[in-house]
């Protein structure tokens, strides 16, 4: 757990979509920059160099604010990976709702979505996710052992 609260700020971005070189998707979509999970094994910590933060990865979160997606049908049949370098269902998603806003803006577009998370908050949006023609959810659990979790400073699963 954090010794202090994470640094959270809202940032305006021109677009929520990033063209991707990943073999699993055409676009990488991350509603947040940073991650408040602070996992010791995190592969996304390289993203810090693209921020203005001096703080360690896992102690800050930039909440992306983007213009409404004007032509969501442009993404029909395209593979969108939501959460490639952040968890789109961080605890802060309850307050900011950026992932839900993204899904609502894409609803009916015909986009194929993949979502990676370790949060049960995704259940809130399950009915919305089901409206996409092809939707995949990857849900990771790093341990079921609460003692191990606590030793590594991780939040509880609930």
Task: Give the predicted meaning of each segment.
Residues 65-158:
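Conserved AdoMet/S-adenosylmethionine-binding subsite of the radical SAM
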Residues 39-42:
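The canonical Cys-X-X-Cys-His
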Residues 36:
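Aromatic- and Gly/Pro-rich donor/ligand-binding loops
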Residues 1-32, 44-81:
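N-terminal [4Fe-4S]-dependent radical SAM core
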């Amino acid at each position: 757990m954090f010794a202090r609260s994470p640094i959270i700020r809202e940032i305006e971005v021109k677009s929520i979509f990033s063209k991707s070189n990943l073999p699993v998707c055409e676009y990488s979509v991350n509603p947040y920059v940073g991650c408040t999970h602070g996992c010791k094994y995190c592969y996304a910590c390289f993203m810090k160099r693209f921020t203005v933060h001096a703080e360690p990865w896992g102690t800050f979160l930039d909440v992306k604010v983007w213009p409404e997606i004007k032509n969501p049908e442009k993404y029909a049949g395209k593979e969108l990976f939501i959460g490639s370098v952040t968890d789109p269902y961080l605890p802060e998603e309850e307050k900011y709702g950026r992932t839900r806003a993204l899904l609502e803006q894409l609803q009916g577009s015909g986009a194929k979505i993949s979502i990676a998370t370790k949060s049960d908050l995704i259940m809130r949006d399950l009915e919305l996710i089901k409206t996409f023609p092809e939707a995949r959810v990857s849900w990771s659990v790093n341990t079921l052992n609460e003692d191990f979790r606590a030793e590594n400073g991780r939040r509880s699963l609930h």
